[in-house]
Amino acid sequence: MNTKSIVFNADNDYVDKLETAIKSICCYNNCLKFYVFNDDIASEWFLMMNKRLKTIQSEIVNVKIVDHVLKKFHLPLKNLSYATFFRYFIPNFVKESRALYLDSDIIVTGSLDYLFDIELDGYALAAVEDSFGDVPSTNFNSGMLLVNVDTWRDEDACSKLLELTNQYHETAYGDQGILNMLFHDRWKRLDRNFNFMVGMDSVAHIEGNHKWYEISELKNGDLPSVIHYTGVKPWEIISNNRFREVWWFYNLLEWSDILLRKDIISRSFEELVYSPKAHTAIFTASCEMEHVEYLIENLPEVHFSILAHTYFASSVVALLRYSNVTIYPCFSPFDYRKILDNLDFYLDINHYKEVDNIVSVVQQLSKPIFTFENTSHDIGNQTNIFSSTEPNKMVEAIRQFIGE
């Protein structure tokens, strides 16, 4: 079987994210040769990784990029590292004719055979366009590059990229801008399935780009082959972009389960860590939710999703100390649909105004609603109403409903 060469840039601060990406690849692929371009990752980490990877006929190469001028180059975002420019050096260190470059904030959900089998048709690389709507883009996203290493090597691409960066780093959009300068008309378009960027999920509706949610919706619940966590990252305390739980699934997988290809690798985050008996939700425009903490504490088998069109007060964010709580500030249409699709019952316990006519929406779904007499937004009184002085009775009713 031919070796699949896969390249990452990384620094020591990102090594846990890098390892999560590698874990996801190893779940579905053998005969891998990872190149990790870095200047500060300890050799002990590579020793342990090579011991693990040997089980699946794979290896990892510690490529140290030293004595470089990259630190002086301007970066478009504060959270980016100069290590992003390390991909320029692919033709100098990768021995194989083809390599797949991946950013470390990526998860792979299946076999990579297709990418290593397709014809590059003489192009210098294959990539996915960097588009955030229905208007085609002439630029590619540099987070996933299928590199024609022979072409890069023959053309001395590394030197050319460094020269262009030296000239234009103040105005170009980082390495991506420079790569597009050099290869602007010499790249093959790939389906977005191979670099599915989710960074717009949580901001498109705020910017009025509602078309995004139609264009980027996946059919039949399928996962993209390559998920790219652009924008807010899934390891941050709050991130409403899609597939957060997918990243955490691979992050928490044990290496022994991956290398032995145990059944768990084909399951989900909930099956791996936490599978609630029921899901509930609260749509609110206020931080005041009647007895919310009491309900959370006394219904540990229920997962609570709290959604708002705005950012949350610190008192709501503090509820994240409970493992059965997720909050959705500035929730998106994707969040809305996901919550309603999973909903078992609704809690109408927020004070002040109702959000998005949610009580009627839930009633149309034929889902039960539990409320207090001082928070009910149901003018028809069709919900299960409890006294705010006896929250224990609501807890008892919910337990009975979910079969506890």
UniProtKB/Swiss-Prot annotation:
Mn(2+) binds at residues 103, 105, 228. Signal peptide: none annotated. Residues 1-267 are annotated as: GT8 domain. One of its GO terms (molecular function) is metal ion binding. It comes from the Bacteria. InterPro entries: Glyco_trans_8 (IPR002495), Glycosyltrans_8_dom-fam (IPR050748), Nucleotide-diphossugar_trans (IPR029044). The keyword 4Fe-4S does not apply. The keyword Signal does not apply. UDP binds at residues 9-14, 103-104, 228-233. Keywords: Glycosyltransferase, Manganese, Metal-binding, Nucleotide-binding, Transferase. Encoded in RD10, a pathogenicity island with an atypical GC content that is associated with invasive pneumococcal disease. Pathogenicity islands account for greater than half the genomic diversity observed between isolates. The main function of this island seems to be correct synthesis and export of pneumococcal serine-rich repeat protein PsrP. In the N-terminal section; belongs to the glycosyltransferase 8 family. May be involved in the polymorphic O-glycosylation of the serine-rich repeat protein PsrP. Has equal hydrolytic activity against both UDP-galactose and UDP-glucose; no glycosyltransferase activity has been seen with tested substrates. This is Glycosyltransferase GlyB. The lineage of its organism: Bacteria, Bacillati, Bacillota, Bacilli, Lactobacillales.
